[in-house]
């Protein structure tokens, strides 16, 4: 982008926790097997770059679960990303504008599956 003298007004960085998150889900697999996303260190360097370039709208994204129906997987991902957003704020004085949890919340496709407990998800995310 710098070579082309292009600096966006908004940017989003994809985070891959790698071995820091032992479990993904059946659809995504384990994070360390994924080809996409940045490590925590790479992402923090990119945030510093974006701040230096005056980019004021910075988001973070992950895709460690998809179509998840169980609260532990969803809440674990939420907690991981909120922790990362807090680290970005504390280390770079940058407030993350948005967090994208990827494929996240699932819907039941089979009769035996229960829908996600949205009230429990909301309470757990507080």
What are these regions (language model features)?
Residues 1-98, 107:
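Active-site-proximal beta-alpha core segment in soluble small-molecule metabolic enzymes
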Residues 101:
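Structured binding elements
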Residues 108, 114-126:
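Anionic-ligand-binding alpha/beta catalytic cores of soluble enzymes and soluble regulatory domains
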């Amino acid at each position: 982008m710098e070579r082309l003298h292009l600096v966006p007004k908004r940017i989003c960085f994809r985070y891959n926790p790698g071995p820091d998150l032992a479990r993904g889900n059946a659809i995504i697999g384990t994070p360390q097997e994924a080809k996409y996303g940045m490590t925590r260190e790479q992402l923090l360097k990119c945030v510093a770059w974006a701040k230096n370039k005056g980019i004021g709208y910075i988001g973070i994204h992950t895709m460690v679960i998809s179509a998840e129906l169980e609260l532990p997987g969803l809440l674990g991902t939420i907690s991981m990303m909120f922790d990362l957003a807090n680290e970005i704020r504390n280390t770079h004085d940058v407030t993350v504008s948005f967090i994208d949890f990827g494929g996240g919340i699932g819907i039941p496709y089979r009769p035996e599956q229960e829908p996600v407990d949205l009230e429990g998800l909301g309470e757990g995310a507080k």
